[in-house]
Regions:
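C-terminal domain-boundary segment and adjacent tail
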Residues: 70-71, 121, 126-173
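Aromatic- and acidic-residue-enriched carbohydrate-binding clefts of CAZyme catalytic domains
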Residues: 1-18
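Catalytic domains of cell-wall/extracellular-matrix polysaccharide-remodeling enzymes
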Residues: 17-93, 132-137
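A short acidic, often aromatic-flanked loop/helix-cap motif at beta-alpha or helix-coil junctions
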Residues: 78-80, 92-99, 161-164
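A generic secondary-structure signal
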Residues: 36-39, 113, 146
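A conserved mid-domain beta-alpha-beta active-site/ligand-binding segment of alpha/beta enzyme cores
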Residues: 85-135
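Well-ordered, non-membrane alpha-helical segments in soluble/globular domains
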Residues: 30-31, 104-109, 137-146
């Protein structure tokens, strides 16, 4: 909706590609992307994350069509086929495109690594450009170090295992 469009315009550098796609185009791109990544890594992918975590209605519908086991946005990880939420809460992430984004990333991550530590699942997203900025790399190290005091590192596929065991999952309303 309107909030996603505002995010795409002001919070990204044009990465909201899946925001305006219809179902068929989103489906085509998801299949092509999955094939490419699986060919590169030699293993199946666990799920799909839209650029900038922005999905339009067509992309949300295509997720279940394509058969991705999970998807994520800024606030949750869910199973597209059922709507079951596998993890809820904001993702800790950094932005390296400008001094202002670097500064806001440092402030948010410092607060989030402590404030979110009580959640059952805390997600951390690192982009390739983030590791080229020394202050962000230090922040990433501190964040992961702090979270490893109370959490075990895992993969998205682990959330699917937990779902099958009925752990963490609540139905998306």
């Amino acid at each position: 909706g309107a909030i996603a469009a505002i995010k795409a315009r002001h919070m990204t550098a044009g990465e909201g590609e899946f925001l305006g796609l219809d179902r068929e185009e989103a489906r085509r791109r998801m299949i092509a992307g999955r094939t490419l990544i699986e060919d590169i890594i030699g293993a199946p992918v666990a799920g799909f994350v839209a650029p900038a975590w922005l999905y339009g209605p067509g992309a949300r519908t295509a997720l279940a069509d394509v058969g991705f086991a999970l998807a994520e946005d800024h606030m949750r990880v869910w199973a597209p086929d059922s709507g079951v939420v596998l993890a809820r809460g904001p993702v800790i992430t950094w932005a390296s495109r400008s001094r202002g984004r670097i500064a806001s990333s440092l402030v948010f991550s410092a607060l989030a690594r402590h404030a979110l530590a009580g959640l059952g699942v805390v997600r951390v997203a690192v982009h390739p450009g983030d590791v080229t900025v020394p202050s962000l790399l230090t922040s990433i190290d501190r964040t992961i170090g702090r979270l490893l005091q109370s959490h075990q590192a895992g993969r998205y596929a682990d959330l699917l295992f937990d779902r099958d065991r009925k752990k963490y999952a609540t139905h998306c309303g």
